[in-house]
Amino acid sequence: MSIIKEFKEFAVKGNVMDLAVGVIIGGAFSKIVDSVVKDLIMPVIGVLTGGLDFSNKFILLGTIPPSFKGNPDSFKDLQAAGVAAFGYGSFITVAINFVILAFIIFLMVKFINKLRKPAEAAPAATPEDVLLLREIRDSLKQR
């Protein structure tokens, strides 16, 4: 069997196609979750914490070079200049994204599992000794 034919058989299997569709939808869905967190949740958290902007929360690990022309309070400006900084605000935002995404996926899986009907178990085959005993019983009844 040629390698191309094997690959074709592999690629058209149901699980591979389902996985591809899932990855594409997941990528699009993560953008929605990013927007929800960045544009809806984080501003509310910022208001509740007194106008705190998490995207600019960082700890400076290095020194700012004298040639730096950006805003020393801007994490993005410091990153662009190559200054070492620990951006914990960005991490908090990503962690919230993850928790929301994981919770939504959990709810989706739970809903799908609820929709699935449990497969009815096939009746167990009657053991051979029971069949033999039934034959003996039936033959005794006929006498």
From Swiss-Prot:
Pfam families: MscL. It is a multi-pass membrane protein. One of its GO terms (cellular component) is plasma membrane. It is found in: Cell inner membrane. It comes from the Bacteria. Keywords: Cell inner membrane, Cell membrane, Ion channel, Ion transport, Membrane, Transmembrane, Transmembrane helix, Transport. The chain crosses the membrane at residues 10-30, 89-109. GO terms for molecular function: mechanosensitive monoatomic ion channel activity. HAMAP family: MscL (MF_00115). Channel that opens in response to stretch forces in the membrane lipid bilayer. May participate in the regulation of osmotic pressure changes within the cell. NCBIfam families: mscL, PRK00567.1-4, PRK13952.1. Homopentamer. Belongs to the MscL family. This is Large-conductance mechanosensitive channel. It comes from Burkholderia vietnamiensis (strain G4 / LMG 22486) (Burkholderia cepacia (strain R1808)). The lineage of its organism: Bacteria, Pseudomonadati, Pseudomonadota, Betaproteobacteria, Burkholderiales.
